[in-house]
């Protein structure tokens, strides 16, 4: 009897501190901070569960001087169980000055995805299946796009990083991994509570066909333009604590801890995420106060 293996795993890598890592999901963000921004992140998800996701992300984006263009490069490595997913992306954005306050950016993303399966990590009975003998690695290109409205206090965005719905191992009728489009909607607003305290509520909504709706809501405080503290809630999934510190004008570090609210909490001690953002300022763009996203 023939058996067809069909899978739909976690699609794009998951982030709790998405508000600082927007370039990975929305190409229109490229250059929007007005400086060269270098970002690195590591996430260990569901600690204590064997084969749980681990993610490493790196990105660089910058505006092009004397133009409305921005460019970006990013790399994401996402490991889940026996799978290893590497994505390299290039982003280009074009920004229109809508008013003295608001800018609207349009972006496109081109990416290449390298997906591999380590059969040595599979159950021996599964790994020995003749139908999986030709399954090792796969490469697929993709295209994405996004829009991003922003000011010094507000941002709203909509994006689809992966328009092409590729089937991994399509030449093997017994082992099919179907990618799906991920639709992202993000937003946030910064309120000045006092000269030394800022408050920013924010949200991210991710829509994937055939998967539950993901809604992340967060609330963060920034004290003296230095210390960030906050919390977040992922609908029916997790609650999070967030912290960050502006070490210098150009260096910002952050950490978040997720505690599961599902049955996974009985098997996992939570998820950890750390990031570092380094920015290079020129004489014109010298930072007066840090932008809170």
Predicted regions and their residues:
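N-terminal signal peptide c-region/cleavage motif recognized by signal peptidases
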Residues: 4-6
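Subset of outer-membrane beta-barrel
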Residues: 10-293
